[in-house]
Amino acid sequence: MAEAVWSTDTGEAVYRSRDPVRNLRLRVHLQRITSSNFLHYQPAAQMGKDLIDLATFKPPQAASGHRPDEEEEEEVIIGWQEKLFSQFEVDLYQNESACQSPLDHQYRQEVLKLENSGGRKNRRIFTYTDSDRYTDLEEYCQKITTSAGEAPSFLVERMANVRRRRQDRRGVEGSKLKSRIITWEPSEDFIRNSHAINTPLQTMYIMADLGPYGKLGYKIHEHVLCVLKVDSNGVITVKPDFTGIKGPYRIETEGEKQEHTSAWKYTIDNVSSLAQPEEEEREQRVFKDLYGRHKEYLSSLVGTDFEMIAPGALRLFVNGEVVSARGYEHDNLYVHFFVELPATNWSSPSFQQLSGVTQTCVTRSLGMDKVAYFSFPFTFEAFFLHEDESDESLPEWPVLYCKVLSLDFWQRYRVEGYGAVVLPVTPGSHTLTASTWRPMELGLVAELRRFFIGGSLELEDPSYVRIPGTFKGERLSRFGFRTETTGTVTFRLHCLQQSRAFMESNSLRKQMRSVLDRLEGFSQQSSTHNVLEAFRRARRRMQEARESLPQDLVSPTGTLA
């Protein structure tokens, strides 16, 4: 007797498909392993004439019209989420009092139709769809007690069917539920455990009733043949994998009596209909046209040519953020900010908004200070064009002004401070802190007025924090102007600079340290290059003249006669 080769690899396999999952078809073949099955493995040459053909002995037909050999071997083709009823479900749903949900009543109607049409075609193989309340307890459930006879309750079965993000949930942040929504200093374990993707899954179980002949319809004899899981991304998980060229899978059941113990083998094959060549060509054309249109759409957004600016010009693009304000006297702070461009050589597009106002923010205590976190983003761009080449002064740079205000219960505001920072000259990420101050009046009455009814001294021109752009004199005097130092405002700026001067690759350009040096030297590039070239030619002529002289005149040891 030859030995059958069983497949022991029951692990899951993962497939990806762009086709609709409703086209999936599986062929499941189930057969009981008996001594007569192994006769097929023996060569025909070994079969003598004296041997009796076992196939001539036909088992008797049962009263139900089915012979035992029909229940020992079965083959069905199952589609995705196709419902095949078991004998237990047929007996259950024939009783109307056992139907509790609308799905149970629907199954009852289907069972009655099957009975009227001659009964179900399947005998042992059946399915549980995603809508059924079935859970593979061996895969999901964890026993609560150490008892070997523990049976899961209805609630345990239902809860085990719920997909949890983290089954091992250790370390609850905070003393009670939702006590800390934001973790300011997350640990590496917290980040790793929290970074989970919850993708919805649809599950289908292909089952088999492996009970002895004449005793079908008992839950204890139900066994899982295959588990199918499909998510919204087209990922199909099959456990165990399709049989293919491997041997069949094997299941052994144990019963109270020796005749109830049996072994079964089954195979799972993918018999989904393949697409016709015409359909594949049409699908490829559709995808090619779709990708082409998407590429044209992206090209229309980006443009065909890289946007260049005029020679000698600089484009400054700033992605900024008002991060926080700290050290102020009152609560409910907000910041009014604007960017001032120098009057000469600087400009900005007409659609650009160079000012903004943050939201009102409540402060929180951080050490000895109160901090208001705004995280307010803003963006702008400006252009610098060095037109006057005769002007040897360094170009001015844009300035970011800010005005911090507070709001009280009666919606009255008071000025908390003025500040300003010069935008960074070099590109990259920068964090700047603006120290602020506010004008003040002498006397207790002014402070009481500011505290109770709001209002305080304000600057008519906020640029007075630095040197105003309208000032034309040589010296700016602030003598007698009383101020009080207040808190600080933190800005985070990401600066991008674009200029044709960055394309210069000669040694002179590499030695320049900032964009100001580049722009200042851009208009003098040709003259500098001419001077260096004339110096090289003069040095070359001097070397040629030196080589043409006699060696005794060139040698330092030569003497006159």
UniProtKB/Swiss-Prot annotation:
PANTHER family: B9 DOMAIN-CONTAINING (PTHR12968), TECTONIC-LIKE COMPLEX MEMBER MKS1 (PTHR12968:SF4). It comes from Rattus norvegicus. GO terms for cellular component: centriole; centrosome; ciliary basal body; ciliary transition zone; cytoplasm; membrane; MKS complex. Residues 314-442 form the C2 B9-type domain. Transmembrane segments: none annotated. PROSITE patterns: C2_B9 (PS51381). It is found in: Cytoplasm, Cytoskeleton, Cilium basal body; Cytoplasm, Cytoskeleton, Microtubule organizing center, Centrosome. Pfam families: B9-C2 (PF07162). InterPro entries: C2_B9-type_dom. Part of the tectonic-like complex (also named B9 complex). Interacts with TMEM107. Interacts with TCTN3, AHI1, TCTN1, TCTN2, CC2D2A. Interacts with FLNA. Interacts with TMEM67. Interacts with B9D1 and B9D2. Its main location: cytoplasm. This is Tectonic-like complex member MKS1. The gene is Mks1. One of its GO terms (biological process) is epithelial structure maintenance. Keywords: Cell projection, Cilium, Cilium biogenesis/degradation, Cytoplasm, Cytoskeleton. Component of the tectonic-like complex, a complex localized at the transition zone of primary cilia and acting as a barrier that prevents diffusion of transmembrane proteins between the cilia and plasma membranes. Involved in centrosome migration to the apical cell surface during early ciliogenesis. Required for ciliary structure and function, including a role in regulating length and appropriate number through modulating centrosome duplication. Required for cell branching morphology.
